[in-house]
Amino acid sequence: MSRLLHAEEWAEVKELGDHHRQPQPHHLPQPPPPPQPPATLQAREHPVYPPELSLLDSTDPRAWLAPTLQGICTARAAQYLLHSPELGASEAAAPRDEVDGRGELVRRSSGGASSSKSPGPVKVREQLCKLKGGVVVDELGCSRQRAPSSKQVNGVQKQRRLAANARERRRMHGLNHAFDQLRNVIPSFNNDKKLSKYETLQMAQIYINALSELLQTPSGGEQPPPPPASCKSDHHHLRTAASYEGGAGNATAAGAQQASGGSQRPTPPGSCRTRFSAPASAGGYSVQLDALHFSTFEDSALTAMMAQKNLSPSLPGSILQPVQEENSKTSPRSHRSDGEFSPHSHYSDSDEAS
């Protein structure tokens, strides 16, 4: 569609044509001017830039704001608007294209100068990362530098901890196996309860001491069983009676006459019968003493012994020693270190046999 132009609009078109005919070294010859767009668009794009911009060099980005170049942009915009089907959409898109073109030219002209002075964004990011601590991370996915080291340290520590646990487990297994072997060797008195480690060591010590005592006997371990406690007391009284020559000698003589006058009685089973030669009396002969016939002598001999010890301090103190030895031979109740008494952990086989 052809549109009629007013006289004022025609004059402006002619001025634009004169500007295009002027020779410009940095532009190619332009085609003939297209028909002028409507007056509304020209009114909007009236040159508002100062004329001093036309004196700038072509390399300066501000030279694109000069009126001559603005005329070229206006003519191209008018040609584009004439061939566009929708005027409203083209009017809105034309200023955007101009702004985009100017921005690209400004970036191209200023890119060469600024690239040599300022480093790129990647270099700036690397420098900042080095200042922060040394971990460089790119958008494309760079590997970290400190994370693998921490993982390696954790792995080494875990391996060391597992190795230490395995060594401790093997040590405890070996110790328990050794205690089991020791429990099988020492006597347990048919006790269903499993002995603790402390009780096992204590029983082993007692058992070893008993075996060493058996080996130190002169008969090679074939010593007779010890007499009962009643026989031991009779031996003690007979020793004390034999040490005196006074009233004790008269009592032994009377006992000897009674034994020779009567028939000899058999020894009951389980009793103690010990015969030994007493020292010579005033008559000059020795007799065999029977301990079973001196039931009334025990109290008198003990009284005489205590009286003699009180009267004569020079009497040796070994007379009362056998009594103390008999009391000490009974197995005392030793207590465990933890305060708990174990009846089976303080006696040996020799004590049971006696």
From Swiss-Prot:
Residues 108-122, 250-264 have a biased composition (Low complexity). GO terms for biological process: auditory receptor cell fate determination; auditory receptor cell fate specification; axon development; axon guidance; central nervous system development; central nervous system neuron differentiation; cerebral cortex development; epithelial cell apoptotic process. InterPro entries: ATOH1_bHLH (IPR032661), bHLH_dom (IPR011598), bHLH_transcription_factors (IPR050359), HLH_DNA-bd_sf (IPR036638). Its main location: nucleus. Gene3D superfamilies: Helix-loop-helix DNA-binding domain. Residues 159-211 form the bHLH domain. SMART domains: HLH (SM00353). Transcriptional regulator. Activates E box-dependent transcription in collaboration with TCF3/E47, but the activity is completely antagonized by the negative regulator of neurogenesis HES1. Plays a role in the differentiation of subsets of neural cells by activating E box-dependent transcription. This is Transcription factor ATOH1. It comes from Homo sapiens (Human).
